[in-house]
Curated annotation (Swiss-Prot):
It comes from the Eukaryota. It is found in: Cytoplasm, Cytoskeleton; Cytoplasm, Cytoskeleton, Microtubule organizing center, Centrosome; Cytoplasm, Cytoskeleton, Stress fiber; Cytoplasm, Cell cortex. The modification Phosphothreonine is found at T414. The modification N-acetylalanine is found at A2. Transmembrane segments: none annotated. It comes from Sus scrofa (Pig). Keywords: Acetylation, Coiled coil, Cytoplasm, Cytoskeleton, Isopeptide bond, Phosphoprotein, Ubl conjugation. This is Dynactin subunit 4. GO terms for cellular component: cell cortex; centrosome; dynactin complex; sarcomere; stress fiber. InterPro entries: DCTN4.
Length: 467
């Protein structure tokens, strides 16, 4: 159960850009590099944006335009659950005959958890079920939009200036055909894209983005600097004396969810558009191969590529821990699980003295010197009690039990510290048959070339010492 409910008890070391210790269930395995990968040593790529409520899929440009929020779904400002649309019947007077009334349907937003409704803040009911809901206007919207446009233009000017300085340093290496006059014409009139050749790396490619004409045509945006105010608006006279009704005061979380308004009273809470979620792909930074790629459809939970480490690396679990005492040898039972369908040979090795990875060990560990053979994974054999087990020459002092692709192994632990938790480290050496190896001719193929030996650094947290 240590890998399911207490995954932090068994950690694997990832030798990436920086060393990361994480449970095997949170790691990936690159079949091309034959190394473990964590979320900190992979590239994250956004595949699609979608709404978790209505499952509407939208491209990245549209999601950016909508500020990564769904236009039709709302979150409750009180409890942050999804709001549902409720229908009700209202009586309205006919325009032709005011004495007569007609029944029409009206729609409003309601929360099924905290009973908040859009009528609580005075939002008018709508005649259609989706869209057209009233949203509060922010007084500083125009100011913020103008500031964004100003800084976007400023960033564009700085980028052009940086590219121009790079070009000036490379002008000494220009071909003779591109004289100073040619460079000036291309730079001034934006002819770089027309003269650009399909061959990458040419000097015209560097000139393509240095168009001054676009910057000259754009009207320079000017903003007014903010003016400091000497006097602030005074507080109301009854601010300190009037009684406070806590049911009408918003919580800190409710205010932080609406940073543009930060409502103080519950009557100022307006529904917020639901945030979009993303489906992302993970790519190895060394070989550029995908480690995880989900299906594009938001309703699908399947993956096109999912190279999780638990499907390729033998998994270590803690089965039983005896009473651990200072400088007394104890026997710990571990289970090794083979996740692949072929036989896997495993050898447990002690960490060498001065190993830079062995920094958290607080106990001396003694592992079995013999090589262990793990049977291949067979889903049908796990539920077949009458199936004959494979015969392996196991040492009863080393192997406690064997069932399907699992093996129970004894290790001996001697705590070296008088207090604190007991942590042991060892190396797990196993063979791996790489099915993603490049295809070669039959005469050049080596039967043992695809099998490689990998070594994993494993740390076990065995709990506190007993007095």
């Amino acid at each position: 159960m240590a890998s399911l409910l207490q995954s932090e008890r068994v950690l694997y070391l990832v030798q990436g850009e920086k060393k990361v210790r994480a449970p095997l269930s949170q790691l990936y395995f690159c079949r091309y590099c034959s190394e473990l990968r964590s979320l900190e040593c992979v590239s994250h790529e956004v595949d699609s944006h979608y709404c978790p409520s209505c499952l509407e899929n939208m491209p990245s440009a549209e999601a950016k335009l909508k500020k990564n929020r769904c236009a039709n779904c709302f979150d409750c400002p009180g409890c942050m659950h999804t709001l549902s649309t409720r229908a009700t019947s209202i009586s309205t007077q006919l325009p032709d005959d005011p004495a007569k009334t007609a029944v029409k349907k009206a729609y409003y937003l309601a929360c099924g958890f905290c009973r908040w409704t859009s009528r609580d803040v005075g939002m008018a009911d709508k005649s259609v079920a989706s869209g057209g809901w009233q949203e509060p206007d922010h007084p500083h919207t125009q100011r913020m939009n103008k500031l964004i446009e100003y800084y976007q233009q400023l960033a564009q000017k700085e980028k052009v200036e940086r590219d121009r300085k790079k070009l000036a340093r490379r002008r000494n290496y220009m071909p003779l055909a591109f004289s100073q006059h040619t460079i000036h014409v291309v730079d001034k009139y934006g002819l770089g894209t027309r003269l650009q050749r399909p061959r990458a790396g040419t000097t015209i490619t560097a000139l393509a983005g240095l168009s001054l004409k676009e910057g000259e045509d754009q009207k320079e945006i000017k903003i007014e600097p903010a003016q400091a105010v000497d006097e602030v608006e005074p507080l109301p006279e009854d601010y300190y004396t009037r009684p406070v009704n806590l049911t009408e005061v918003t919580t800190l979380q409710q205010r932080l969810l609406q940073p543009d308004f930060q409502p103080i009273c519950a009557s100022q809470l307006y529904p917020r558009h639901k945030h979009l979620l993303i489906k992302r792909s993970l790519r190895c930074r060394q070989c550029e191969h995908n480690l995880s790629k989900p299906e594009f459809n938001p309703t699908s939970i399947k993956f096109k590529i999912q190279l999780v480490a638990v499907n390729y690396i033998p998994e270590v679990r803690i089965m039983s821990i005896p009473n651990l005492r200072y400088m007394k040898e104890s026997q710990v039972l571990l289970t090794l699980t083979n996740p692949v369908e072929n036989l896997t040979h495993v050898t447990l090795l002690e960490c060498e003295e001065g190993d830079p990875d062995d920094t958290n060990s607080t106990a001396k560990v003694s592992v079995p010197p013999t090589e262990l053979v793990l049977a291949g994974k067979d889903a049908a054999a796990e539920y077949d009690e009458l199936a004959e087990p494979q015969d392996f020459p196991d040492d009863p002092d080393v192997v406690a039990f064997r069932k399907a692709n699992k093996v129970g192994v004894f290790i001996k632990v001697t705590p070296q510290r008088e207090e604190g938790d007991v942590t042991v480290c060892f190396k797990l050496k196993h063979d791996f048959k790489n099915l993603a190896a490049p295809i070669r001719p039959v005469e050049e193929a080596d039967p043992g070339a695809e099998v490689s030996w990998l070594t994993q650094h494993v740390e076990l947290s065995l709990g506190p010492l007993l007095p």
